[in-house]
Amino acid sequence: MTFEEKRVGHNIINQLPDSLLCEIFFNLPTEEVVKTSLICRRWRYVWQSLPGLDLVINGSKNYDKFDFLERFMFLQRVKLRYVGYGHNCRNMTSMMMNNVIKHKIQHLDVGSNRRYVYDRVEIPPTIYTSCERLVFLKLHRANLPKSPDSVSLPCLKIMDLQKINFVDSLDMEKLVSVCPALETLTMDKMYGAKVSSQSLLSFCLTNNETGYLKTQVVMQTPKLKYLKLNRQFIQRIVINDLSSIVMLNLDDVAYFGETLLSILKLISCVRDLTISFDILQDYRHFSKSKSLPKFHKLSVLSVKDMAVGSWESLLIFLESCQNLKSLVMGFRDYNWGINFSDVPQCVLSSLEFVEVKAREVADMKKLWSYFMENSTVLKKFTLCLDHIEDQRDHVMLSKLFTFPRRSNKCEVVVRLRTFGTYKPMSMFSCADGF
């Protein structure tokens, strides 16, 4: 590129209005944006009007180079990632955090990429008292100070806490309970014995590590609509009010201890359910000796990673779901000898949408025949495949789209996880990617 071409390009950018320049700068690393003040005199102060910043901070470097934080005028969104710590780093971290917090920001995302305990980010006490406008808070590998008697987070709606160190377990309970606008809470584990909130709509436990919750989970959340428990070994769960919960996600939950019947009671209140095949197995086992609750409200059911033998358990579970309209199944393996003679009432009379996720076409031939032949009101059957290997798979899919259906309104769709491995034929439709 010639000097003249560079000059023309520079002039074009320089003619853009400040508002558009801010949009461009907002998508660049913050340090690079600050450097633009050296390129053009007019840009010297534009970056100070940006509503957000995204910084990766190495604690071994000089913190003085970040003194530009004080010059932002309209700061609303801040993301800080610490990748290393140096001498006197903890004090400097608190100073930077205080500089950010005094801007009365609305969105704060702070974390450390370091795994050592002593490399956690130190959050200053001002997080409790000087964030009156804060709406979103995400902390990862951070140390939270002891909460004061008075905590002021009146606008906080979304809070995500991962690998946090509280001084006292009661601090977590207090932090949640004193946020009058809190709607969504996500944590990697229970940092206290209770979640109490009059405004909470969604609660997720996302821990990917196995282990027992040593304390019971107590939920005092009268407006809760969505509950997700992921890979938790739960000894006891107590929910004081079940009437508000609409969606329940128990994917990857393998053991409930003494609470299975309580969980089944919870399931009986929800309309949208995601469960692991372990729960299906337990339900089948207990159904032989106990009278278990029915799930008349359940409209949407998703079961992931179904293993050999879980089909029979699913059929028994479906017998208790007389009004089910949508069923999603993911198979990690398949048993050609499973029983297809039993047909639950919901398959016959209420099921409208079926989605099957599998590795190969051949595994699913009997399964799609089962739903096509028995479902009278089926509107859509979706088959999601990892791949299609050869011509035999194409022929088998052709049979799927021409297979007789008991419901004349049924649409058939095939989705492929990998692109370019399957070309749709004229007789049917195909959607790529899922």
From Swiss-Prot:
Keywords: Leucine-rich repeat, Repeat. LRR repeats lie at residues 72-99, 114-141, 164-189, 204-231, 252-277, 306-331. It comes from the Eukaryota. Residues 336-385 form the FBD domain. PROSITE patterns: FBOX, WD_REPEATS_1. CDD domains: F-box_AtFBL13-like. Residues 10-66 form the F-box domain. PANTHER family: F-BOX/RNI SUPERFAMILY PROTEIN-RELATED, PROTEIN WITH RNI-LIKE_FBD-LIKE DOMAIN. This is Putative F-box/FBD/LRR-repeat protein At1g16940. It comes from Arabidopsis thaliana (Mouse-ear cress).
